[in-house]
Amino acid sequence: MADINLKGMGVALITPFKEDESVDYEALGKLVDYQVQNGTDYLVVLGTTAETPTLTEEEKKNIISLVVTRVRGRIPIVLGVGGNCTRSVVEKLKTDNFEGIDAILSVVPYYNKPSQEGIYQHYKAIANATHLPIVLYNVPGRTGVNMTAETTLRIAREFDNVIAVKEASGNITQMDDIIKNKPARFNVISGDDGITFPLMTLGAVGVISVIGNAFPREFSRMVRLALAGDYDSARTIHHSFTELFSLLFVDGNPAGAKSMLNMMGFIENKLRLPLVPTRIVTYEKIREVLRQLSIKC
């Protein structure tokens, strides 16, 4: 198993689309460069923010190839590999080409709402199917089921290649329970930009960020300051983004992030159905906040 450190700010990359809704690979390449050059510690490819369920298998392969080629080993790449059919996920892990991939992010099975034992058995099968480091992903607002602290810790203790959990349950008490009782080699990563700072004061090691798509330099600085224990300086940056945290998700993710990147000139403001762009009122509110942050748009 490769030695990988996912402390700091990872960015869950969006997938840019052209006006005809084809993937804008040129824009994606520029976004990757923007991330690498502005302090992002690692990239997460084909996660929720990438609109992955709307992508074809060919598009997914092309995106992975582009990101790996563009990054050139400068920062780690984490690939989203998950699903609600354990057998299919295991088969994918055994047969796909993972050259250039440093770890995988695997979401709790969604829709079919497994029990805690089912979640454990799912991740056991995944851990036994790959040599790659695994980041668990708990996001009950999307999956319909919460992976409890007890289950998370059970998996963390039993499988050495399970190295972290991306926690997006919104339950600070649950996250703190994991932080207090986890193995030393296992880390908790925030899955929510808005609670990253408070969670890091409890011992989380960073975030897989959405807002970092637009603000990699600023948000990664906040994370580094928090890791260094400079909570006063980190708090100041956190507070500067407070209004934007909520605005980005008013009309769903990644609609808010794409609105920001559109205003900043990176991408077309296109999503694939069933997702749609932010409402005009939300778009204008985001624009006003960006102006207050002195971002040209």
Curated annotation (Swiss-Prot):
SMART domains named among the record's database cross-references: DHDPS (SM01130)
Protein name per Swiss-Prot or TrEMBL: 4-hydroxy-tetrahydrodipicolinate synthase
Organism lineage string: Bacteria, Pseudomonadati, Bacteroidota, Bacteroidia, Bacteroidales
Purpose of the protein: Catalyzes the condensation of (S)-aspartate-beta-semialdehyde [(S)-ASA] and pyruvate to 4-hydroxy-tetrahydrodipicolinate (HTPA).
Gene Ontology CC entries for this record: cytosol
Species this protein is from: Parabacteroides distasonis (strain ATCC 8503 / DSM 20701 / CIP 104284 / JCM 5825 / NCTC 11152)
Quaternary structure and partners: Homotetramer; dimer of dimers.
Gene: dapA
Active site: 137, 166
Entry EC no(s): 4.3.3.7
Compartmental location: Cytoplasm
Main localization of the protein described in the UniProt heading: cytoplasm
